[in-house]
Amino acid sequence: MAAKNSVSLQKAIDSLSIQDVYLKSSQAECCEDFDPKRTDHTELLVQQMHTVRRSEVLKTNEGELILKVYVRLGARWVLPIENDDPEVKAFVEADFIAEYSMAELLETEAVEEFSLKNASFHVWPYWREFLSSQCERLRLPRVVLPTVQFNC
């Protein structure tokens, strides 16, 4: 059974409507000494990163309220080293923005809770496609990310 939303989160859900999800920036790289086509990938570990960096409420010239949520996602292929930090062989990172129209001005608490618990749900399909595409272009091992809902 799903956990019941807090009052402030439910108010945000009722007030916000997704308008757009887009890529703000990205970076992808294989290290100089790493040839993904000719490497034994069984020794590599895949680590993931996901963070909601920030959110902001804007008022357009037409008086509309917009919530922008900045979400950073990443994956990296590492070679574990005993008693030391792993050696990064390749990585793919992306910053996405999710934009929502806001029916009424929300309290900061509601905006923050929504940003942390719901925005990633809207960004995730774009990240899955982006990561899959970058893996193919870089000839990295395919990473299949599950469909996911973030309910922290």
Name each region found by the language model.
Residues 1-121, 129-152:
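N-terminal intrinsically disordered, cationic/polar leader segments
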